[in-house]
A protein has these predicted regions:
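An accessory alpha-helical subdomain
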Residues: 150-173, 181-182, 186-192
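Conserved small/polar residues in nucleotide/adenosyl-binding loops
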Residues: 193-198
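A glycine-rich (often HGG/GG-containing) alpha/beta subdomain
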Residues: 1-149, 153, 157
Length: 198
């Protein structure tokens, strides 16, 4: 059964032979999991004390075996996409390496993320609204420049801002109608002074 409070992990890049592969971890145990598998190049550095929004070079290890050299990025909540603690492990992009690192992360306490679960958490934690969550998928699926631009406008809140504006206008109109029903004479007076000039 899926628990929305589990620490989750997934491969964030296309799985292919490439220069870099990224494994993303999000949740309250992200740093604890990292501490079990990451050895910073500077051995004096405590993994739990790594600074927010900084890159750290080191090795991913499975016990004493070095699996890969990597760069780790720390994004502590609420200053991350999901508003949770997030760790990104940038390793070499070979298929075998990426899956080995992901399996180490899963073995040490994370659960494999469902498709779209990072964006779902961003929505549930108030980082983005529903319109912006839909825009993320539209951006990923965009096939041309116009679709990309429209998705970015929506992701930046363009549609959300317009919806908020329309909501405020509707609330104002409802209040005006309720006022007219409560006091018809006042309504007639208001119409006289708010009607457009001929």
């Amino acid at each position: 059964m899926i628990n929305e409070f589990d620490t989750i992990a997934a491969i964030a890049t296309a799985v292919s032979n490439a220069g870099i592969g990224i494994i993303r971890i999000s949740g309250s145990e992200a740093m604890e999991i990292l501490a079990k598998i990451f050895e910073p190049y500077n051995k004096k550095v405590d993994v739990y004390q790594l600074e927010n929004h900084r890159l750290y070079y080191g090795n991913i290890k499975d016990g004493e075996e070095v699996v890969d050299e990597c760069i780790v990025l720390i994004m502590k909540g609420p200053h991350s996409y999901t508003k949770e603690d997030v760790v990104e492990i940038d390793c070499h992009g070979g298929v075998t390496v990426v899956y080995k690192v992901l399996n180490l992360v899963l073995k040490n306490g994370a659960r494999a993320a469902e498709p779209g679960e990072f964006t779902k958490r961003a929505f549930l934690n108030g980082r983005i609204d529903l319109s912006q969550a839909e825009a993320v998928m539209d951006l990923i699926d965009s096939k041309n420049e116009m679709a990309r631009k429209n998705s970015m406008t929506q992701l930046k809140g363009g549609l959300s801002d317009r919806i908020k504006q329309l909501r405020e206008e509707i609330i104002y109109q409802i209040a005006f109608i309720e006022s007219a029903l409560d006091d018809p004479e006042h309504y007639s007076f208001c119409l006289l002074y708010t009607s457009p000039s001929p």
